[in-house]
């Protein structure tokens, strides 16, 4: 029977789905045919983690190579396929659009012929709900085939395995080799869409049908002309923009539901505004407009209990999201990009946990996603981190003659006269407050016993320091002076745009009394400014026995 000497149906479909492109035709198995080796190698996606696979045989057949063609004979149901599963496969086919072409009581050969005729143009990635997806779900419940010489059915990627019997096989990712719904931390793997392949004749090599979702995080500095980057700097209390961009699995079409979660961990000194969250789906990399998502009520959560500071944006089924305007369904394909934007700030109510300089206030995100179209497992992406930097000022007030004499209780105001990110109309009008934030009301700093003023949470920019008149009795009032914090280095490059974690700062001071304001220094994000005060002058007088006249801050006092 010529029909039983080749499996045009099973082979053609298998070669399409399994990625094996050798020509197949109906032919006799002759004496000169190459004997079967039953070897297959499944190549792992280069970005996938360690995974294993299991094989399930659907049809058994004698398979050989002849004249560059793969030839099969004696097609029958595999021994491991129960009568119930065979019946269910036939029922699934009869429910298909072209089921009328299948006889009422079909043989294995009839089923193989039908598959070849109706499925040979199918996509290499099996779509959820397609007939092959249904068949894969039915066959997965059977006992997997153990490779030759192995003690277990699961086998690793990128190695050749062989089987006792040739024929038509289904290959699936071993559920135990990837993350589950409850245990996925650090498991950066995804499962393949069903792979259908013919094993026999020459060795077969296929590549798993999957792709690893990725996530990138960016932060935008409000300095004019800034773009999304890995680093920014800001004032305490200033809202800073963040962006998360996630991709989906290459085989997302194979999933019935697709769990998708951004888990964003903020360092202790940061606080997010969960009401600022927006999610937009872009069709592909060329799509610049996107479609904003109508967020479910439980999509955004913000947990700040204990040591946690976690913002989550999650979808129990990303494939079911709708547009914010109009509620129409948004198509999720392998090319889709999911973008989350929100704002966060260095917390003015928790400045003791704000990091000055160093490696900044880090903020990292990871993606948690459905990892297997054939099970309910989850995987976890490689995390991505951005950093928000802020700086501190240590102003030291001392006597101009004796540097060991520190001046206590001297008052100063610090005005942001050129900070990078001041709102329009606010430049030169806002004052630095005790916690480093900016406000419209004047705030007066007072030197401590060490003659110091310490304030952290400053952004890059220019600040004007003003000594309050009369707050330093016995000394002349210091003229106003400015200092400038910049991330632009002497060679003109901006350290905010470079990869190294720690920023290089350039600090300068502009002053009229050049000998009273020392050149500022920088150490790990803290700017030290030493300012000196001269004592008032004792002028010689005549005619006033026992009385001196001292000039103080432009006024005269009798002593």
Name each model feature, range by range.
Residues 2-559:
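Solvent-exposed loop/turn and edge beta-strand elements of beta-rich ligand-binding domains
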């Amino acid at each position: 029977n010529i029909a039983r000497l080749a499996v045009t149906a099973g082979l053609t479909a298998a070669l399409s789905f399994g990625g094996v492109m050798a020509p197949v035709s109906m032919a006799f198995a002759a004496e000169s045919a190459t004997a079967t080796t039953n070897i297959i190698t499944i190549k792992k996606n280069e970005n996938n983690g360690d995974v294993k696979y299991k094989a399930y045989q659907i049809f058994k057949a004698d398979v050989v190579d002849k004249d560059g063609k793969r030839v099969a004979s004696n097609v029958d149901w595999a021994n491991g396929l129960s009568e119930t599963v065979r019946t269910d496969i036939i029922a699934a086919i009869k429910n298909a659009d072209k089921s009328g072409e299948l006889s009422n009581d079909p043989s294995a050969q009839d089923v193989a012929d039908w598959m070849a005729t109706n499925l040979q143009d199918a996509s290499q990635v099996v779509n959820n709900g397609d007939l092959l997806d249904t068949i894969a779900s039915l066959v997965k419940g059977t006992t997997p085939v153990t490779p030759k010489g192995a003690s277990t059915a699961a086998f690793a990627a990128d190695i050749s395995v062989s089987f006792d019997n040739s024929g038509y096989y289904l290959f699936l990712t071993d559920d135990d080799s990837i993350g589950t719904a409850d245990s996925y931390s650090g498991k950066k793997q995804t499962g393949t869409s069903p792979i259908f392949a013919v094993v026999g004749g020459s060795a077969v090599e296929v590549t798993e049908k999957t792709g690893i979702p990725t996530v990138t995080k960016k932060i935008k500095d409000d300095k004019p002309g800034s773009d999304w980057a890995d680093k920014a700097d800001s004032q305490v209390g200033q809202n800073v923009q963040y962006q998360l961009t996630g991709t989906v699995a290459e085989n997302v079409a194979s999933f019935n539901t697709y769990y998708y979660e951004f888990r964003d961990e903020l360092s202790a000194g940061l606080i997010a505004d969960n009401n600022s969250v927006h999610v937009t789906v872009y069709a592909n990399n060329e799509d610049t407009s996107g479609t904003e998502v109508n967020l479910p009520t439980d999509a955004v959560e913000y947990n700040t209990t204990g040591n946690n500071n976690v913002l989550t944006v999650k979808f129990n089924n990303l494939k079911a999201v709708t547009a914010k305007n109009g509620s129409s369904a948004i198509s999720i394909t392998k090319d889709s990009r999911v973008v989350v934007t929100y704002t966060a700030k260095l917390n003015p109510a928790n400045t003791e946990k704000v990091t000055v300089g160093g490696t900044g206030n880090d903020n990292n995100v990871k993606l948690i996603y459905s990892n297997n179209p054939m099970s309910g497992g989850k995987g976890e992406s490689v995390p991505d981190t951005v950093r928000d930097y802020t700086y501190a000022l240590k102003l030291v007030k001392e006597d101009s003659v004796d540097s060991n004499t520190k001046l206590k209780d001297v008052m100063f105001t610090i005005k942001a006269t050129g900070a990078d990110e001041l709102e329009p109309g606010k430049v030169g009008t806002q004052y630095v407050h005790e916690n480093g934030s900016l406000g419209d009301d004047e705030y007066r700093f007072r030197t401590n016993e060490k003659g110091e003023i310490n304030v952290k949470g400053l952004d890059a920019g220019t600040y004007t320091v003003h000594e309050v008149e009369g707050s330093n009795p016995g000394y002349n009032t210091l003229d106003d002076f400015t200092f400038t914090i910049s991330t632009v280095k002497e060679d003109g490059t901006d350290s905010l745009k470079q990869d190294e974690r720690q920023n290089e700062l350039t600090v300068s001071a502009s002053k009229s009394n050049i000998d009273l304001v020392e050149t500022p220094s920088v150490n790990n994000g803290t700017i030290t400014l030493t300012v000196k005060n001269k004592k008032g002058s004792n002028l010689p007088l005549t005619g006033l026995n026992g009385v001196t006249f001292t000039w103080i801050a432009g006024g005269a006092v009798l002593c």
